[in-house]
Amino acid sequence: IIIGSGIAGLYASLLARERGSVLVLTKASIDECNTRFAQGGIAAPVGRGDSPQLHFQDTIQAGAGLSDPEAVRVLVEEAADRINDLIRFGVPFDTQEGEVALALEAAHSVPRILHAGGDATGEHIETTLSRQARSNGVAIKEHSLVPRLLVERGRARGVRAVDLASGREEEYQGRFIIRKAIPTVDSWEVPVIQSPLSN
């Protein structure tokens, strides 16, 4: 069970679907998420002359001491593989002369910003991932708010959801519960079990 249908939730649903059945619960329609409104591009060290180490240095310097070095390290080391996943899922990144186009922006020392549809990157990623999720058999339940986990012996075993159209409560069971970006996270008393599929 995946809670949320933004880029993180849809991406996780496609990876998890490679290993079993998946249900995505989202409080609005699948195309009503913040991902759709994300403009600009995605930074990843995928170009010639670039590296995770250089990307790390640029990011730490631009962060002016506010960046968590371990989080930045994970981000830059994983970025190229995640971009390759998005390409595999069909995200139409802009190209130039047959290769992914890379722009030089902000505090980056080399071109490493990928765009899709110019500044409509978020919309293109969300549209592509939601289409792939549906065509790959990911079950999607829209207008379903998840206020509570179902816990058994200290482990999350499912969720209680409210169908926002009917007001009816529904329960869903699952071996793994993945939550990514939901506003009520801090109100949950029991931690969610993170699936190894999300790594």
Q: What positions do the PLM features span?
A:
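N-terminal Rossmann-like FAD-binding beta1-loop-alpha1 element of flavoenzymes
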Residues: I1-V24
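Short glycine/serine/threonine-rich phosphate/pyrophosphate-binding segments
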Residues: G9-A12, E170, D186-S187
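Generic hydrophobic/aromatic pocket-lining and core-packing "Φ" positions
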Residues: A12-S13, I83, V190
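Short, glycine/charged-enriched secondary-structure capping and boundary segments
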Residues: A16, F37-G40, S187, P191-Q194
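Conserved N-terminal/central alpha/beta ligand/cofactor-binding core
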Residues: S21, T26-R157, A161-D163
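Core beta-strand elements of the Rossmann-like FAD/NAD(P) dinucleotide-binding domain
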Residues: A165-F176
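Glycine-rich loop(s) and the adjacent beta-strand/alpha-helix scaffold that form part
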Residues: R175-N199
